[in-house]
C-alpha cells in the first residue's frame, strides 16, 4: 500500500470527505472487493456506462468511504481478469478492478483506442485551443457538477479544472508526508504558506475530475473539456524537481508555462547584443526578426537584444520541459488524442504592460523553437476581482495585442480575469472574436461563501460563521503587523469593507478599536477582508487564524478540509447555482454562447429547488 493511502486510513480520512488527496480513488481494495463479491449495497453510478473493445464498463462506489471500482461486463463470456491490475472475477462473469491511478492510466488507453473522440478524459481539441473559460479549483472539488451542468446546457467545452502546480496542489505526496514541501510567499499575510495549500494532489485532482464526469453522465454529451496545469514553473529552484512535476501533470491536457522562476535569477549582460551573438543561434535570431517583421512590427534593435538576453535562458528550459511533457505522454499513452496537449505562454510576469512587440518576439521565439502556442497571456494591468475602469482604453490595449496574436494563430489569455464587468468581458469577446481564455479561479471561494451565507442549514451556518471569524482575526492581526506590506494590505481590506458600508475608516488607534469597527458590520461574503483571506481556511489546522496553522498537511488540516465536504445539499445547490450562473454570464458576455441559450440556462437554474434536479440536467 502506498504511503499516502496508509496515512489516510490510519487517520480515518476517507475519500468521501477528503477526495483527491491520494492519487487513487480506492484506499482499501480488499474490503471493497469483498463487499461487491458478497452483494453488499454498493452504489452503481447509472450514467457512468462506457464501452471499450473489451466490453461495457460501469463505475461502482462505496458511498460511505468514497472507494470506487470499475466493473467490466462482457456479452456472452467472461471478462479478462488481467486487463487492469488487481482484477477479481465475479460469479456473474463480470470483473471488478480498483480505481487506482495506475488503472486509470491504462483505462485511458483502452477508451481512446476504442473511441479517439471520447470525452471522458480531458482533451486538447482545436476548439479548446481557441476559446475557453478557465475554472479554477482554488480550494475544493465541489465545483465540478456545476461546471458540468454549465457545459452541458451551453453546449460548449471549457477548462473544467485549473490549478497552479505546485502552488495550489501537492505535486508529490511522499514529499508532503516527509514534511519537505517548499513554501510559497504570500506578502499580504506576511508569511510563507506550504505548497499545495488546497490539500489535494495533482494526480488526485486529475483522477477525480474524470470520475465526476462519469458520475454525472457528462461524458454522454460528447463535449470535449480540458484540464489546465496552470503556472508550471520553469527554471530557478524548480530545476531539481521538474521530472516530478512532469509526472504529476501527465493527465493535464493544457500546460501554462510560467518563466518567472528563471527570469528572477537572470541578469542581462551590459552588452546584450554581444551576449546574444555569442549565445543564441544566429539563424534563430534572423528567423525571429523576419517573423516579427512579417507580423507588421518594427523592432528597436537595442530593446530586442535586451529582451532576448533576458528570456533566452528561460526559453531553453521551457523547450526542454516541453520535450519532457511530450515524452511522458508518449511513454504512457497509445493514441494521438491521448498524447496531445495545449500550450499557454504566460508573459504577464515580464515588467510593465506588455507591448505588441514583446508579444510578437515571444511568439516568434516559441514558433522558431517548434512550440505551438495556443494561448498567450500579456499583462493588461488587471487587478484580481476588480473591473477594468476604462473600456475604451481596454479595447485599445486588446486590439494591439490581438493584431499580433491573430497573425500567429494564438488566442489571448486573460489572467486575473475574474470579477470584471459585463462591459469588460464584452470588449474582450468582441475584439478577439471569442478567441480567448479567461482565468477565473479567484471567484469560486467567494461563491461558496455566498452559498453558505444563504443556506438555512445549521451546520452550513456554523461553518460560515467560523469561516468569517477566521478572516476577521487575520485582518486584525495583519492590521497591526510589523511587516509593512501585511499591515498596509490588511488595512486596505478593512477600510474598503467599512467605507462600502458607510462607516468611518479611522479605526486603527488600537486592535480593540479595529475589532469594534469590524464587529459593527453584519457578516457578509462581500467584505473585502473576507474575500482576500478566505481561501486559507480550508487547510488551516483546527480552523485557527494563525500563520503556523495555514496550509497544514497533517490530520488536523485534513479534518478541517472535511468540513467543507460535509456541507448540506442545500449548500451544494446554492454553490452549484452560483457557479453556473457566473459561467453563463461569462459565456454570454464574451460571445462564447448565444444569448438565447444563456437565457434558457438561467431560467432552468432559477427553477431548481433541490440538488438532484440540477444534477439530472447534466447527462444526455
Predicted regions mapped to residue ranges:
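Active-site capping/gating regions of soluble enzymes
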Residues: 1-213, 217-220, 224, 237-261, ...
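Short, charged/polar micro-motifs that form catalytic or ligand-binding hotspots
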Residues: 134-138, 297, 301-312, 349-352, ...
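Aromatic- and acidic-residue-enriched carbohydrate-binding clefts of CAZyme catalytic domains
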Residues: 181, 271-305, 379-381
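Active-site beta->alpha loop and helix N-cap motifs at the rims of alpha/beta catalytic domains
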Residues: 196-211, 225, 231-239, 285-297, ...
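Conserved, mostly hydrophobic/aromatic
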Residues: 230, 345, 415
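Short, conserved phosphate-binding/catalytic loop or strand-edge motifs used
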Residues: 337-343
Amino acid at each position: 500500500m502506498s504511503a499516502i493511502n496508509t496515512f489516510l486510513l490510519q487517520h480515518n480520512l476517507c475519500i468521501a470527505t477528503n477526495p483527491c488527496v491520494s492519487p487513487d480513488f480506492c484506499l482499501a481494495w480488499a474490503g471493497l472487493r469483498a463487499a461487491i463479491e458478497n452483494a453488499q449495497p454498493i452504489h452503481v453510478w447509472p450514467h457512468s456506462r462506457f464501452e471499450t473493445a473489451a466490453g461495457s464498463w460501469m463505475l461502482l462506489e462505496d458511498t460511505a468511504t468514497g472507494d470506487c471500482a470499475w466493473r467490466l461486463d462482457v456479452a456472452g463470456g467472461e471478462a479478462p481478469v488481467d486487463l487492469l491490475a488487481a482484477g477479481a472475477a465475479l460469479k456473474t462473469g463480470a470483473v471488478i478492478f480498483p480505481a487506482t491511478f495506475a488503472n486509470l492510466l491504462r483505462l485511458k488507453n483502452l477508451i481512446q483506442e476504442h473511441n479517439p473522440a471520447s470525452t471522458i478524459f480531458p482533451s486538447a481539441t482545436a476548439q479548446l485551443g481557441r476559446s475557453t473559460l478557465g475554472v479554477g479549483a482554488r480550494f475544493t472539488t465541489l465545483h465540478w457538477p456545476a461546471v458540468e451542468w454549465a457545459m452541458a446546457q451551453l453546449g460548449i467545452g471549457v477548462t473544467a479544472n485549473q490549478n497552479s502546480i505546485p502552488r495550489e496542489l501537492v505535486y508529490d505526496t511522499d514529499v508532503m508526508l516527509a514534511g519537505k514541501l517548499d513554501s510559497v510567499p504570500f506578502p499580504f499575510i506576511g508569511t510563507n504558506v506550504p505548497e499545495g495549500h488546497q490539500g489535494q494532489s495533482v494526480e488526485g485532482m486529475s483522477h477525480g475530475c474524470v470520475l465526476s464526469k462519469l458520475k454525472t453522465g457528462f461524458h454522454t454529451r460528447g463535449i470535449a473539456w480540458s484540464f489546465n496545469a496552470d503556472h508550471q514553473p520553469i527554471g530557478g529552484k524548480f530545476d531539481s524537481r521538474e521530472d516530478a512535476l512532469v509526472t504529476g501533470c501527465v493527465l493535464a491536457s493544457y500546460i501554462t508555462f510560467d518563466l518567472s522562476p528563471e527570469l528572477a535569477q537572470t541578469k542581462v549582460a551590459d552588452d546584450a547584443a554581444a551576449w546574444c551573438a555569442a549565445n543564441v543561434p544566429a539563424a534563430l535570431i534572423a528567423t525571429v526578426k523576419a517573423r516579427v517583421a512579417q507580423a507588421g512590427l518594427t523592432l528597436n534593435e537595442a530593446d530586442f537584444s535586451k529582451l532576448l538576453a533576458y528570456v533566452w535562458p528561460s526559453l531553453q528550459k521551457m523547450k526542454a520541459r516541453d520535450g519532457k511533457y511530450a515524452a511522458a505522454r508518449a511513454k504512457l499513452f497509445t493514441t494521438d488524442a491521448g498524447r496531445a496537449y495545449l500550450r499557454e505562454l504566460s508573459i504577464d510576469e515580464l515588467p510593465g504592460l506588455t507591448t505588441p512587440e514583446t508579444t510578437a518576439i515571444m511568439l516568434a521565439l516559441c514558433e522558431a523553437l517548434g512550440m505551438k502556442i495556443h494561448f498567450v497571456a500579456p499583462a493588461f494591468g488587471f487587478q484580481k476581482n476588480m473591473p477594468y475602469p476604462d473600456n475604451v482604453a481596454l479595447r485599445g490595449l486588446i486590439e494591439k495585442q490581438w493584431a499580433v496574436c491573430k497573425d500567429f494563430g494564438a488566442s489571448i489569455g486573460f489572467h486575473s480575469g475574474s470579477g470584471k464587468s459585463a462591459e469588460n468581458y464584452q470588449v474582450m469577446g468582441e475584439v478577439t472574436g471569442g478567441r480567448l481564455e479567461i482565468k477565473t479561479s479567484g471567484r469560486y471561494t467567494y461563491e461558496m461563501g455566498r452559498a453558505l451565507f444563504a443556506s438555512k442549514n445549521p451546520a452550513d451556518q456554523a461553518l460560515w460563521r467560523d469561516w468569517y471569524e477566521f478572516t476577521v482575526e487575520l485582518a486584525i492581526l495583519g492590521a497591526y503587523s510589523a511587516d509593512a506590506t501585511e499591515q498596509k494590505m490588511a488595512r486596505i481590506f478593512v477600510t474598503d469593507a467599512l467605507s462600502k458600508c458607510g462607516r468611518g475608516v479611522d479605526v486603527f488607534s488600537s486592535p480593540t478599536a479595529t475589532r469594534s469597527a469590524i464587529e459593527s458590520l453584519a457578516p457578509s461574503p462581500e467584505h473585502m477582508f473576507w474575500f482576500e483571506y478566505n481561501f486559507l481556511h480550508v487547510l488551516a489546522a483546527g480552523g485557527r487564524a494563525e500563520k503556523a496553522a495555514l496550509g497544514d498537511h497533517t490530520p488536523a488540516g485534513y479534518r478541517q478540509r472535511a468540513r467543507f465536504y460535509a456541507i448540506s445539499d442545500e449548500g451544494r445547490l446554492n454553490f452549484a447555482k452560483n457557479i453556473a450562473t457566473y459561467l453563463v454570464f461569462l459565456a454570454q458576455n464574451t460571445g462564447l454562447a448565444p444569448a438565447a441559450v444563456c437565457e434558457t440556462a438561467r431560467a432552468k437554474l432559477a427553477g431548481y429547488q433541490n440538488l438532484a434536479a440540477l444534477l439530472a440536467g447534466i447527462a444526455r
